[in-house]
């Protein structure tokens, strides 16, 4: 694509995931970064050098760390290790206890600066629907308890978790509350360039979520200064 067509294609797009080992990926990452798109590395079998080349080209974040990527293998380290060792890039964590073992969560916060960890739900359309089966794109998925899997093959396929549950999970796993809250609020806002939200300060948008002190259940929600959910 020429520059004009690429700019039209990504208009309004904030984040895109790219596997850095694919042919032409570093050049595409550079072009997308120049257009203001936040490039995330993921769904990848990249080696450590290929991963670092992707970050060097302008990728700034990492799609659901450890999931659907080359990992931390002592002889063949891949994308997960590259992301953990680079203090400048963000990493996403699906903290539903199914996608990444909770024993690994403290490792992430120990290796990464606190401002570079993001909590994500990876929730799909089944979340909150009450249905036990549905579609993920063109793939049929089913829900078994809290686990979503492909009907054909049985692989994990997204989540039905929510950020309030993930916040509770990481705090109960020993992550300091302030670090967990930041990973679910300020850090994502900063990654997306949303300078008017994500923290509490005079002049910023008043977005608040009030959680139960014990269960972390959502009690009240304020959006742009107006209460839209009250218990």
Where are these regions (language model features)?
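Short glycine-rich loop/turn motifs that provide flexible caps or phosphate-binding loops at active sites
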Residues: 41, 57, 157, 192, ...
